[in-house]
């Protein structure tokens, strides 16, 4: 990595990011004469939500009025617009050909009543099941654009609290794995079986669950979005952008603060994911900033359908994010991961530069119904369906990591797999890693390191275990 590039990254790290104020009170976004949304003249083929009865006062439930504007716009492939204000709403469903414009001075605020999010067939956390719709849905539609400089706020703390309350009941019973499925929390934005969809320039706050979920979709662009999920608390499982069994996806210029994976590839869980067998493929992620998350770039843990042809570049990851590059799965997930390229990454005070953990979080990853529980939902059976070991261990190969700089790390590598399915053909080039410890690599074959500078303060080299043909260390 060049000196010039390092200087640019350090300058970006130091520069403050302008963010819309989030006070948690509706009066902070009261309409003003100077707001962009209020002052913009109405253009032809636009549909103003207040013409359909929306109030935008922060207390009235405006779902029906906004949906009426969307339905009208769909008839002419028009644009839905808002006057400045706070619009409280439940689930909205964007339709073919609609542009949905949330301008500066507009906040869409999610209802805190779960009844305002209708149940729909979808996939959640790797299995197909019925689940509450998201706040904004592109559900089996195409040619949709979601744009503007305004705010979409999930108002999700009530759902975070309900999750933690359930965990306090479930963890002592040995059913921690069920909590994420039983506590039905709305995602912020869902693209499901959608095509040719674009979201741009918006600020996304306080998702009740995942923020942007792209599932069974293709030709999707996420551009220049700000995600802030740690306002007023730290929302559990508030992933930033999840790309789930989808193809031809571009994510560019996302600035993310969340309390789980920031940029995440998914492809189904265990027996259900193996049944569906749809990969995530042809994905480009570039020029993103991760300020606080469980990991910067994540593959898994839902790997059953596999990943291929994924290119990640221009990523900056900062403390307190604990891991920069993460591959995670379990011995019941299965799936093939190959054709991954990760480049031009800068990490500042991120404890672990790269981790591969294929036995991740057993209390969540391995579902087993205790004998004393007789009455349970059908998806518990799906989750607990055994997967033969020969199908359950994932295979990782053909991973190329290059041009990475890490400053202030604790460990460079925490990489391991299973002896019966070692990691194969990983290439590392032009790495400059400043870490306390070099770390370890286990169950690896055909790993190559070229032009790698590893400044381990403990003076030890990478600990190689049960590996062969590892060159350049």
Report the location of each language-model feature.
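Extracellular/periplasmic carbohydrate-active domains that bind, remodel
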Residues: 2-473
């Amino acid at each position: 990595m060049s000196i010039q590039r390092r200087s640019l990254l350090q300058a970006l790290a130091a520069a403050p990011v302008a963010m819309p104020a989030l006070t948690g009170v509706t009066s902070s976004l009261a309409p003003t004469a100077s707001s962009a949304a209020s002052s913009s003249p109405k253009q032809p083929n636009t549909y103003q939500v207040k013409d359909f009865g929306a109030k935008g006062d922060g207390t009235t439930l405006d779902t029906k009025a906004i949906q009426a504007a969307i339905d009208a716009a769909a008839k002419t492939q028009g644009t839905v617009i808002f006057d400045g204000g706070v619009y409280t709403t439940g689930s909205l469903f964007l339709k073919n050909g609609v542009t949905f414009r949330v301008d500066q001075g507009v906040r869409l605020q999610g209802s805190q009543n779960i009844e305002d999010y209708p149940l729909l067939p979808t996939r959640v956390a790797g299995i197909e099941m019925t689940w509450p719709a998201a706040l904004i849905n592109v559900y089996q539609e195409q040619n949709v654009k979601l744009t503007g400089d305004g705010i979409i706020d999930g108002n999700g703390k009530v759902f975070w609290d309900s999750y933690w309350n359930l965990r306090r009941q479930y963890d002592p019973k040995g059913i921690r794995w069920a909590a994420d499925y039983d506590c039905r929390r709305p995602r912020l934005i869902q693209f499901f079986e959608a095509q040719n969809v674009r979201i741009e320039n918006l600020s996304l706050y306080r998702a009740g669950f995942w923020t942007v979920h792209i599932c069974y979709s293709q030709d999707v662009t996420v551009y220049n979005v700000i995600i802030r999920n740690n306002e007023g608390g730290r929302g559990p499982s508030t992933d930033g952008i999840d790309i789930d069994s989808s193809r031809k996806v571009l994510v560019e210029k996302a600035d993310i603060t969340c309390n789980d994976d920031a940029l995440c590839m998914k492809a189904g869980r265990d027996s259900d994911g193996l049944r569906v067998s749809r990969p995530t493929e042809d994905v480009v992620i570039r020029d993103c900033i991760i300020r606080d998350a469980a990991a910067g770039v994540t593959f898994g843990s839902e790997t059953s359908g596999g990943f291929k042809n994924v290119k990640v570049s221009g990523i900056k990851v900062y403390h307190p994010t604990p891991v920069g590059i993460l591959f995670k799965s379990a011995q019941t997930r299965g799936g093939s991961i190959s054709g991954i390229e990760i480049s031009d990454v800068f990490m500042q005070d991120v404890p672990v530069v790269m981790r591969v953990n294929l036995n991740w979080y057993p209390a969540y990853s391995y579902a087993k119904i205790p004998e004393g529980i007789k009455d349970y939902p059908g998806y518990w059976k799906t989750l607990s369906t055994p997967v033969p070991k020969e199908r359950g261990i994932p295979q990782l190969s053909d991973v190329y990591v290059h041009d990475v700089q890490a400053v202030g790390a604790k460990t460079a590598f925490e990489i391991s797999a299973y002896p019966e399915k070692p990691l194969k053909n990983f290439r590392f080039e032009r790495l400059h890693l400043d870490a306390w410890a070099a770390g370890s690599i286990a169950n690896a074959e055909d790993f190559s390191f070229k032009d790698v500078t590893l400044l381990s303060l403990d003076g030890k080299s990478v600990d190689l275990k049960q590996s062969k043909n590892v060159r350049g260390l």
